[in-house]
Amino acid sequence: MNVLIIGSGGREHALAWKVAQDPRVQKVFVAPGNAGTAIEAKCENVAIDVLALEQLADFAENNVSLTIVGPEVPLVAGVVDLFRSRGLDCFGPTAGAAQLEGSKAFTKDFLARHKIPTADYQNFTEIEPALAYLREKGAPIVIKADGLAAGKGVIVAMTLTEAEDAVQDMLAGNAFGEAGSRVVIEEFLDGEEASFIVMVDGKNVLPMATSQDHKRVGDGDSGPNTGGMGAYSPAPVVTADVHQRVMDLVIWPTVRGMADEGNVYTGFLYAGLMIDKAGNPKVIEFNCRFGDPETQPVMLRLQSSLVLLIEAALAQALDKVEAQWDPRPSLGIVLAAGGYPGDYAKGAIIEGLDAAALLEGKIFHAGTTLQDDRVVTSGGRVLCATALGDSVGSAQKNAYALAAKVDWQGCFYRTDIGYRAIARERGEDQE
């Protein structure tokens, strides 16, 4: 069989790499893909944009029996609806169900309706009421652009001035365009974050391995938010007890609530959670797809066939399958272009990929492209160096050894990915 994967990031390279390992799969097409998917065994790039929905459907109709959607933008635009209307198998939520990521206001209202734990909040489209609410609540407080903003439309304001500036920027200054014409202001939550990703077939749920992302650009979680600078799996904060609570309090009510409201959910569902000291989860956000960079360490640990699991999901038979995981932790470090998440240069030649390929682990490509057979940078997050280890500490050591082999002008990465889990392993107190 042939499979199409829509997207061009590190997540899509990891999905393509995993799908290609299934002996039944002859060819994995990636649209539009990157340099990594261009050179990956059994993989081939197709020059179709993620929003060229009709072209994607035409290609799928003629070439593949299954399509997997990586990024959120085509999901919110209705790629799954189009594929279904043409009788094509496509794994992901419909546009209606993808509102869980496409609109933060929709999500907060949905959570409130179904009594799913989340931060207290209000939605605003006008500046004055928003500022009045800020002054009433005080800082720290969180301001979110309502629509899709590539993971960057969230400001955690530690002072009232910072909060007021963020609201002004979004509602008046048009900082995030259409995405920021409505804002959600919510209480600041204390605790530890975890990424809880499951597969959903409309009624059954299959949890994936847990993970923890590192959103801030700098060491010690400093600097602005990014799409994610690294991740590891599993997340020790999600104990067996917390796992059960998340399923009972968050995942099941979400899947049933969406179905009750006429938006039956099929696809990957990613709950971004804050876990407090007592182990109580609250929903920070939903994503209607696998996380990036979480996909990379999670796929490294998945031993089952991803294709088999997705086929089960499309047949509403997720209750009949189990996912097998490598018991060892994995960790991925994002190598980014200097200046990210702000402006950055493109077109730098990446050195050392062949040397890195000789080490244990895997380098997944994100913002890369091929130019005259050389791999060059083409995005802010460029590569993700990912490795397994007997502990998070050893996975970290292996991943950094991999990252150290690679370089280009302006390359940078955080040096502390996994620090919370490693402190836990050493028995140090978590602050």
Curated annotation (Swiss-Prot):
Note describing how the cofactor binds: Binds 1 Mg(2+) or Mn(2+) ion per subunit.
Keyword Transferase: no
Record's keyword annotation contains Magnesium: yes
Signal peptide coordinates: none
Cofactor: Mg(2+); Mn(2+)
Record-linked NCBIfam families: purD
Family: Belongs to the GARS family.
Protein name: Phosphoribosylamine--glycine ligase
Organism, scientific name: Pseudomonas syringae pv. tomato (strain ATCC BAA-871 / DC3000)
Lineage, highest ranks first: Bacteria, Pseudomonadati, Pseudomonadota, Gammaproteobacteria, Pseudomonadales
Gene it is expressed from: purD
